[in-house]
Amino acid sequence: MTQKVGVLAIQGGYQKHADMFKSLGVEVKLVKFNNDFDSIDRLVIPGGESTTLLNLLNKHQIFDKLYNFCSSKPVFGTCAGSIILSKGEGYLNLLDLEVQRNAYGRQVDSFVADISFNDKNITGVFIRAPKFIVVGNQVDILSKYQNSPVLLRQANILVSSFHPELTQDPTIHEYFLAM
């Protein structure tokens, strides 16, 4: 069965995710409207600016449709996408997870680091990255950086505080496709 991956495309770094999936031979749909959710099997919520993203979700009246989709289908949130999926006022509140926004510093503090995932070293690109500070019992920690979780999964939802789409390594995207 051919799967179609949707990439939320109202703000942020959606094109790099789309390009990564296309390089893997996966059909991609840029999701901008409520009816776009009807033709996809899984969704990526990309990084960007979480407050702006929330405002646009509400302005375009797709917050409820996004919530319903993310409640049952595979979803991957990177950076700001992970914030939107976590606990907090106005967030989707679908993860047993609390985050601290911009915990790794401002834009000028961005960095690249090696992290381990499934016995493989991968590159993590951290740009104004959130820190996962309260991780509930239902959440699996898949990878850490300096003893802090940076890649997590809870049921159908995968989140990273870093940007795997900004590397040439498809490891995390392949993992998401296999969920």
Curated annotation (Swiss-Prot):
GO terms for biological process: glutamine catabolic process; pyridoxal phosphate biosynthetic process; pyridoxine metabolic process. Pathway: Cofactor biosynthesis; pyridoxal 5'-phosphate biosynthesis. InterPro entries: Class_I_gatase-like (IPR029062), PdxT/SNO (IPR002161), PdxT/SNO_CS (IPR021196). SUPFAM superfamilies: Class I glutamine amidotransferase-like (SSF52317). GO terms for cellular component: cytosol; glutaminase complex. The keyword Nucleotide-binding does not apply. Belongs to the glutaminase PdxT/SNO family. PANTHER family: PYRIDOXAL 5'-PHOSPHATE SYNTHASE SUBUNIT SNO, PYRIDOXAL 5'-PHOSPHATE SYNTHASE SUBUNIT SNO1-RELATED. This is Pyridoxal 5'-phosphate synthase subunit PdxT. It comes from Francisella tularensis subsp. tularensis (strain SCHU S4 / Schu 4). The gene is pdxT.
